[in-house]
From Swiss-Prot:
PANTHER family per the UniProt record, alphabetical: FLAVIN-DEPENDENT THYMIDYLATE SYNTHASE
Pathway: Pyrimidine metabolism; dTTP biosynthesis
The keyword Ligase appears for this protein: no
Organism: Ehrlichia ruminantium (strain Welgevonden)
Enzyme Commission number, as recorded: 2.1.1.148
Name of the gene this protein is made from: thyX
Chain's role: Catalyzes the reductive methylation of 2'-deoxyuridine-5'-monophosphate (dUMP) to 2'-deoxythymidine-5'-monophosphate (dTMP) while utilizing 5,10-methylenetetrahydrofolate (mTHF) as the methyl donor, and NADPH and FADH(2) as the reductant.
Cofactor(s) for this UniProt protein: FAD
Methyltransferase keyword on record: yes
Protein's name in the database: Flavin-dependent thymidylate synthase
Quaternary state and interactors: Homotetramer.
């Protein structure tokens, strides 16, 4: 009983101490909470290091932290973001626990600037959980984008597709179970499963590279199934580093960059000149994108 009493006393002392690390109350409120994504997936914040304060502290290391106001911190972060000074943003890190379909994970790991540890089907048995898209997300192949969707299928055709997906997903899991019952190794049994089965991982990344990931994967041209994860994570970033998030939206997420030729077109249009695409050397796709931006049709 004496040992137990001492342990309780030590634990109570540890709980009563105030941490000296930077704490963001808005993130403390959502630590370990699941944010549902797709039909069975989720994003869960596991840990974080730093805040907006860490960014400005790193940027001001040459002359100390000083006594700066929030407006001055915001102005500095805006400057860093506008001029692509990335190192200060690398001082913050965040770790997520994510559950996602395997085909989404394969896109995700193309971003090689994170630390990843994935659930291993060599050591553990996978659950009978697979992704089935909602009917309005079952679409034709895009005619002008080799990677993208076109128009949605009719409800009847979409239902046909999802019914087949469910049938095949159930069938391959039954095969997977038969292999396991027969004593086939897990690392061989798993290869029968399809790409819509769910996996899980821990994913840790610094703020700069996270923002790069989110800029690409939250874009309207990104595949829907990865975009919804990015949108969920953006909301977490907004709580974590609100000044950095505001600068990111202003200078990256909702801004536009132009090629030299496109900028020349913009200048001529501002000057009231008529401009034909054929006279600019700009390709059809870039021209269409430029006109969409100028017409605010995106």
């Amino acid at each position: 009983m004496l040992v137990l009493s001492i342990r309780i006393k030590v634990w109570q002392t540890m709980e009563s101490e105030i941490t000296k690390r930077i704490v963001v109350p808005e993130l403390e409120d959502i630590l370990y909470k699941e944010h549902k994504v797709l039909d069975k997936g989720f994003v869960r914040l596991v840990d974080y290091m730093g805040s907006d304060e860490s960014v400005v502290q790193a940027a001001r290391i040459s002359y100390g932290r000083g006594t700066k106001s929030v407006s001055q911190d915001a102005a500095l972060i805006n400057y860093l973001m506008r001029h692509s000074h990335t190192t200060p943003f690398e001082m913050c890190e965040i770790k997520f626990h994510i559950k996602l379909p395997i085909f989404v994970a394969r896109q995700w790991v193309r971003h090689r600037t994170a630390n990843v540890n994935e659930y291993s089907a060599r050591y553990s048995v996978l659950d009978h959980e697979f992704y089935i898209p909602e009917l309005d997300h079952v679409a034709t192949q895009s005619e002008d984008n080799a990677q993208g969707r076109g128009n949605s299928l009719s409800n009847e055709d979409a239902q046909y597709v999802t019914d087949l997906l469910k049938r095949d997903s159930d069938m391959v899991y039954e095969t997977y179970n038969k292999f396991l019952i027969k004593g086939v190794s897990r690392e061989i049994s798993r290869i029968s499963l399809t790409l819509n089965y769910y996996t899980e991982w821990y994913w840790k990344i610094d703020l700069h590279n996270l923002l790069h990931f989110l800029r690409l994967r939250s874009d309207v041209h990104a595949q829907y199934e990865i975009r919804v994860y990015a949108e969920t994570m953006l909301e977490i970033v907004k709580k974590w580093v609100p000044l950095t998030y505001a600068a990111f939206v202003e200078y990256c997420l909702e801004s536009q960059s132009f090629s030299k030729s496109a900028l020349s077109v913009v200048k001529k249009l501002i000057a009231g000149e008529d401009v034909a695409r054929e006279d600019t050397g700009i390709g059809k796709r870039e021209w269409r994108e430029l006109m969409d931006v100028l017409a605010d049709n995106k």
